[in-house]
Amino acid sequence: VYHNHTLLHDDLMDRSDVRRGKPTVHKVWNDNTAVLSGDAMLILAFRYMTGCPPEHLKEVMDLFSLTTLEICEGQQLDMEFESRCDVTEDEYIEMIRLKTAVLLAGSLKIGAILAGATAEDAENLYNFGMHIGVAFQLQDDLLDVYGDPEVFGKKIGGDILCNKKTYMLIKALNRADEKQHAELNRWLNAEAFQPSEKIEAVTEIYNQLNIRNICESKMREYYTFAMESLAAVAVAEDRKKELKNLVKLLMYREMSVSYTHLRAHETLRHL
């Protein structure tokens, strides 16, 4: 419920028209409906959290509250980056850690707390979720440029059109020669353009600079960090099967989005 709250507000702020292959709430209804629906989901999420066992309630609510604040901070950074041309790789990784990764990390740690895990195992699960969350967002950046819209569930090139300072754009700006840098800046500063032309031009520069492979390499790096954290959790390997299946669903989005989303939901429900 909380995750859907963030998506409703995120789509509104980004003016995204499609989510999971369907029109977004503010497109079907209006902006006010999207804001109020998202707010209601946030309230419901906190209400559900109060159903935790009393002995864990304070620790769970503290972590959940911190997570929600961090996600707001990440979204604010994401919006600020759109008007900046000097965003660094480290700043971007920190932004996606806050905006995306801490939600998965916090969810896993809350589950560990409620299951009576040791503090060390709970922290290892948190780190597992955080690293997978970063890898997932890097993959999301990649799919926004190179994905199939039928599989991705969103229009391709949205990040390019709104000048999102993604890992790919940051790397391209750092690696570009004088001519490529000027071309990128021309598109970043253009006020009137054909969307398809801008997407094609920026993607071509990414291709020239091997940005796709660079992004995939960084994604695999965080995937490796995540699996190392999962390996450190002191439970039998067969008990980690569902988490490994979840990782496969998140990191290999090759099936239809609706089916992948359903399987991910079922996996989380049975953890």
Where are these regions (language model features)?
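Mg2+-dependent prenyl diphosphate-binding active-site environment of isoprenoid biosynthetic enzymes
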Residues: V1-H181, N185, E221, K248-M251
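Alpha-helical structural elements of signaling/regulatory helical domains
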Residues: E55-H56, G116-E120, R175-K179, F193-Q194, ...
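Hydrophobic, well-ordered secondary-structure elements that form the walls
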Residues: L169, A226, L243
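Generic leucine side-chain signal with a strong bias for well-ordered alpha-helical environments
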Residues: L7-L8, L230, L243, L268-L271
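Short, amphipathic C-terminal "tail helix"
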Residues: Y222, D238-S258
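Conserved small/polar residues in nucleotide/adenosyl-binding loops
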Residues: T260-H270
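Mobile late-domain/C-terminal helix-loop "cap" segments
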Residues: A176, A182-V233
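Alpha-helical, largely C-terminal catalytic domains
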Residues: L103, K218, V233, S256-S258
